[in-house]
Amino acid sequence: MKAVRYHSYGGSDVLVYEEAGRPVPGVGQVVVQVAGTSYNDADSGLRAGLRQDMLPLALPHIPGLDLAGVITALGEGVSEWRVGDAVVALLPADAPGAAAEYVAVSAEALATAPHTVGLADAAALPLVGLTAWQALFEHADLKPGQSILINGAGSAVGGYAVQLAAQAGAIVTATAGARSRDRVRSYGADRIVDYAVTPVVQALAGQHFDVVLQLAPAGPEENAHLVDLVADGGAFVSVTTPGPQDAGRGVRAVHVFGRSDAAQLTELVARVDAGELVIEVAERLPLADLATVHARAAGRFARIAELAARAEGGVLAERLRADPAAVRAPAAAGELVGKTVLTP
């Protein structure tokens, strides 16, 4: 089968579109013919080896955390799925990914794919949708009537977060630029702050929110200012760089990494099919173009990585110093904007 793989950690140039062995299902697994996968900045982090101390990969590695496709084979012990079922899943980061024609995946990770959108487009849902859900309802414990600031609402996670928070009955203030402002408003935001006109902290000076959800890359100083916007007893939840606790005011600071959860993904799919949740796809490309997609995201990813290294220090900072080309490769023409779906 055809797949994109990398045989060593590094920049986008280590990604190779090549022949790879077709997987067979293990016990409790199914094989899925991939209809689509999508790019996430986490894919660049794994490719660059930034977390190899915590999450070493067996090389060569097939990337692609998001999966949408059709089951073609069942492993021993799988009874709840059938060949021909259309499914979506968030794959383990250290397992072979969906940037291939076929992938083996645990049956327990699967959810039935939405039937109201194209199957390939459904690959834009798992990681970012689950991250938004878990940030809001597991970590922030968002309740109806609470106020929330979503910083970076124009991002892929932000789009889902605005929709879910509004549907939960929260009062949503969202930051967005001119490019995404109308879309974010259509998702249910009660108020839009244009960060390009006035810095967020300045625009919201003196206001407080039960929850601040940080989706934009930021350094420790900016995160500290955002924590100041959290009401006493509230939560600062970040999916980018961590923020400081404010124990004196009872403010919790949580750093979120999205994880696979089939039940939550099933709920997200149900909302898509009910017309309550919009899957936004900015671009559709052939899988062979994945290296170009990584290159187009290089500028944004480099900033995220460098800010994370400033915030965390330690091994991550050392790794960036040792191999700066892994994250600072020149971006290709045309910066990556929105969610990109890739099809074999």
Place the predicted regions along the sequence by residue.
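C-terminal hydrophobic helical "lid"/dimerization subdomain
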Residues: 1, 265-344
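Residues located in well-ordered beta-strands
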Residues: 2, 16, 33, 68-70, ...
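N-terminal glycine-rich beta->alpha transition that marks the start or flank
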Residues: 10-14, 19-68, 81
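Hydrophobic beta-strand signal
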Residues: 31, 68, 88-89, 104, ...
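NAD(P)H dinucleotide-binding glycine-rich loop of Rossmann-like/cofactor-binding domains
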Residues: 56, 80, 88-152
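A glycine-/small-residue-rich N-terminal strand-loop-strand element
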Residues: 68-92, 169
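Mid-domain Rossmann-like dinucleotide-binding core that forms the NAD(H)/NADP(H) cofactor-binding site
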Residues: 125-194
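Glycine-rich cofactor phosphate-binding loops and adjacent beta1-alpha1 units
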Residues: 173, 185-254, 305-310
